[in-house]
């Protein structure tokens, strides 16, 4: 059977490429790799939107090979979706940070909304750390975690 060999990127559909790029670059520290307008027949076939006008920005998390692809779809009827954590689909994306409380202060001062104030997990791999769900310009939950362990290091309670 074929196997997945590693993660490539996470794609997020956005209403405004400019606004979302600013959020991830200026507020979360991602670096812009490139912006492009990929126009080819296979794009329409792959996405299921024959006449799509796609604009994309590729962002990189500093110091690691973690990439976000922000996608703005043109020539397509856009529909808002409810990004609530319990709804089917992508619930959130998550990143480690060195000071969740400072992130919260800085981001809320700049008008970024959150689901709650930072919390201290009492169970699981992030026990004793700090966590927060911030909300990006399109309603996507962005979890910031301050913890000494990753999922791969967790051995259970």
Where are these regions (language model features)?
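Core segments of cupin and vicinal oxygen chelate
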Residues: 13-65, 125-127, 133
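Vicinal oxygen chelate
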Residues: 14-18, 64-65, 72-138
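Short, flexible helix/strand-to-coil boundary loops that buttress conserved ligand/catalytic motifs
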Residues: 24, 107-108, 155
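Aromatic/pi-system hotspot detector in well-structured domains
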Residues: 79-80, 143-145
């Amino acid at each position: 059977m074929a196997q997945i060999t590693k993660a490539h990127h996470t794609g997020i559909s956005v209403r405004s490429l400019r606004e979302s790029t600013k959020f991830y670059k200026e507020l979360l520290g991602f670096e812009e790799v490139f912006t492009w307008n990929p126009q080819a027949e296979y794009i329409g076939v792959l996405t299921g939107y024959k006449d799509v006008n796609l604009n994309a920005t590729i962002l990189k998390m500093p110091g690691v090979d973690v990439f976000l692809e922000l996608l703005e779809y043109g020539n397509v009827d856009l529909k808002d979706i409810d990004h609530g954590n319990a709804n089917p689909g992508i619930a959130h994306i998550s990143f480690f940070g060195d000071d969740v409380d400072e992130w919260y202060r800085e981001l809320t001062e700049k008008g970024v909304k959150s689901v709650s104030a930072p919390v201290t997990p009492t169970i699981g791999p992030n026990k004793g750390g700090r966590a927060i769900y911030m909300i990006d310009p399109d309603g996507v939950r962005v979890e910031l975690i301050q913890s000494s362990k990753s999922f791969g290091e967790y051995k259970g309670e």
